[in-house]
């Protein structure tokens, strides 16, 4: 339809008026969105500050190979500190338990567990569905071996490899896993590992972080007390159902140490799980 000049002029004024209104409304919307983002950011910063301090650590990693299903339950601490605007997670391991689906007992000494010393690393934080989420990235950590590049350097296969170290101080290469099949049949495996784990956890209340662990660790057997054990435990893969690999952190005092954690383990954490898949 042809418009007259007057109609066009009126339409232009109307459009300008609507445009001015839209700009004003858009500015209000933008301001509201900006305020919402600022509020979300303030909430995240406040919740992130609440992470600071020492947390007791419990995690389970479910592994399986062709013959054996295994749970490794680890205990320790995570210390969250602030540095340069980032939250840094410093992890420490204290002791561990193992469970299998076979009549075989395997164990790792506290010294071997404490030899696992992941590097401190920044964690990622955000708010998901109103809950603070904390994500620690994988930090490849050698144990029983010294690696210049922990992320890519190959693991040894020879116990005489000069990179192999006695990290648990028992006079054997690598770290020692004790195996008990029967009272008469016991022995040791000497292994080197590259610990590669990451976690995602959500803050529940003020004093609990709950989530799951993702593990891509590598392990090689570099010796045994008896050749019969040499085929044991060379290749493990994490069971894909991550609900079998939970992590739980509980806030504790800064003065807590491994001895106190062991003494109060049952008060803080659920019973040790069994292989059930």
What are these regions (language model features)?
Residues 8-21:
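Bacterial N-terminal signal peptides
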Residues 37-43, 183-277:
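Edge beta-strand at a domain terminus
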């Amino acid at each position: 339809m042809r418009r007259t000049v007057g109609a066009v002029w009126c339409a232009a004024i109307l459009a300008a008026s609507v445009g001015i209104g839209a700009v004003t409304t858009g500015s209000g919307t933008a301001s509201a969105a900006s305020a919402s983002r600022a509020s979300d950011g303030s909430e995240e910063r406040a919740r992130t500050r609440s992470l600071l301090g020492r947390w007791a650590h419990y995690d389970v990693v479910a592994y399986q190979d062709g013959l054996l299903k295994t749970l490794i339950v680890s205990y320790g601490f995570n210390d969250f500190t602030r540095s340069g605007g980032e939250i840094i997670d410093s992890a420490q391991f204290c002791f561990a338990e193992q469970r299998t689906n076979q009549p075989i007992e395997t164990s790792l000494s506290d010294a071997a567990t404490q030899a696992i010393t992941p590097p401190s690393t920044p964690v990622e934080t955000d708010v998901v569905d109103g809950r603070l989420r904390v994500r620690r990235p994988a930090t490849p950590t050698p144990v029983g071996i010294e690696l210049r590049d922990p992320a890519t350097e190959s693991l040894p296969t020879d116990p005489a490899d000069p990179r192999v170290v006695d990290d648990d101080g028992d006079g054997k290469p690598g770290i020692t896993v004790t195996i008990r099949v029967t009272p008469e049949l016991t022995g040791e495996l000497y292994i080197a590992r590259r610990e590669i784990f990451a976690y995602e956890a959500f803050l529940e209340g003020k004093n609990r972080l709950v989530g799951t662990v993702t593990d891509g660790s590598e392990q090689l057997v570099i010796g045994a007390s008896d050749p019969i054990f040499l085929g044991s435990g060379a290749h493990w893969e994490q069971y894909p159902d991550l609900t079998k690999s939970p992590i739980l952190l509980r806030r504790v005092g800064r003065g807590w140490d491994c001895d106190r954690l062991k003494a109060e383990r049952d008060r803080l954490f659920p019973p040790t799980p069994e292989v059930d898949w």
